[in-house]
Curated annotation (Swiss-Prot):
This is Probable phosphoglycerate mutase GpmB. The active site is at H9, E82. HAMAP family: PGAM_GpmB. Keywords: Glycolysis, Isomerase. PANTHER family: BROAD-SPECIFICITY PHOSPHATASE YOR283W-RELATED (PTHR48100), HISTIDINE PHOSPHATASE FAMILY PROTEIN-RELATED (PTHR48100:SF1). The record marks H150 as: Transition state stabilizer. Substrate binds at residues 8-15, 21-22, 58, 60, 82-85, 104-105, 151-152. The lineage of its organism: Bacteria, Pseudomonadati, Pseudomonadota, Gammaproteobacteria, Enterobacterales. Belongs to the phosphoglycerate mutase family. GpmB subfamily.
Length: 215
């Protein structure tokens, strides 16, 4: 059975400012760096063999801190990037016009093929994060990878593994530097394929980030 750990990046400046990040970027806060160090301490006891990270700056930095703790190399995979939020990226939630808020709600509330202008749909996000996950099956036997990604991307992945629509990620609370675990199993008696073992564990953190943006 392959165990794969999923980690959301540490708190960023834009998380704290309630600003939409998407595939744009802002640096980790001091709290975000501390959260990543606490993930590293936990990861050291989990037997992690590979770290695979989104290539955006906030995930890169989170992965670097974790890698220092557990002594693993990092592979960067663009398929683990956050949802492309198009023309709304870098905007503060409270500054959106009624029309812009409508675009955002269409996307996150499950409108079929909904997307923000210039961005991508939840189905497109789901397709690429599942492709990244499938690559873990090609790792050597006995591997235990840790994937560093983003709130919407990881929520979409966990939701769809559970058989829910991609936009059901809104119902998952994956806080900054939370740890989830999914397993790949082959069994005649249990569900074969990917199963969710845990989601959104923050027991390793002193104080979880207070942001609710999930991105």
């Amino acid at each position: 059975m392959l165990q794969v750990y999923l980690v959301r990046h540490g708190e960023t400046q834009w998380n704290a400012e309630r600003r939409i990040q998407g595939q744009s970027d802002s640096p980790l806060t001091a709290k975000g760096e501390q959260q990543a160090m606490q993930v590293g301490e936990r990861a050291r006891s989990l037997g992690i063999t590979h770290i695979i990270s989104s290539d955006l700056g906030r995930t890169k930095r989170t992965a670097e801190i974790i890698a220092q703790a557990c002594g693993c190399d990092i592979t960067f995979d663009f398929r683990l990037r956050e949802l492309d939020m198009g023309v709304l990226e870098k905007r503060q939630i409270d500054s959106l016009t009624e029309e812009e808020e409508g675009w955002r709600r269409q996307l996150v509330n499950g409108t079929q093929d909904g997307r923000i202008p210039g961005g991508e749909s939840m189905q497109e996000l789901s397709d690429r994060v599942h492709a990244a996950l499938a690559s873990c099956l090609e790792l050597p036997q006995g591997s235990r990878p840790l994937l560093v990604s983003h709130g919407i991307a990881l929520g979409c992945l966990v939701s769809t593994i559970l058989g829910l629509p991609a936009w059901a990620e809104r119902r998952l609370r994956l806080r900054n530097c939370s740890i989830s675990r999914i397993d790949y199993q082959e069994s005649q008696w249990l569900a074969s394929g990917w199963v969710v073992e845990t989601a959104g564990d923050v027991s390793h953190l002193d104080t979880p980030a207070l942001d609710e943006l999930q991105r």
